[in-house]
Amino acid sequence: MTTLYIAQSPIMQDWGADVGISKHLYKVGVTEDAAKDAVAELNAEAYAGHKDWELIGERVVSAVDAAGLAVRLGERQKVIDPLYYPKLKGAKDIVKLDQRKVEANVVIKRTMAGHDSKVPKLKPVDMADYIMDSLGQNSWS
């Protein structure tokens, strides 16, 4: 059972806002174990130089490996280059989201479901759902 998970680091998000990248920075990963265990491992190894990773979303997907995830991620989201931002310490799977795109996606989903089209206040779970939906996890090859 392969699990796709999304994690956030509040300290890294503050750093992203300070340097002008975006405060919406998320780590996208895949694991064969439980997603909580994978996030605990991120904290233990201080992934990207941070020990405050929190799990914000997870989905069980069909077989996918880290290389396949990296390719799909690069095609669909803006992946932050660790060579340009050395503070990321070589982390190659940190994505930057545009809040307006996520808001538009949520509004379209709500409108199609027959709910009001008011722009909601986004939560980390909304960001994680947007990333997982954009990766098209149901069509992994």
Placement of each model-derived feature along the sequence:
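Non-catalytic accessory segments flanking enzymatic or RNA/DNA-binding domains
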Residues: 1-141
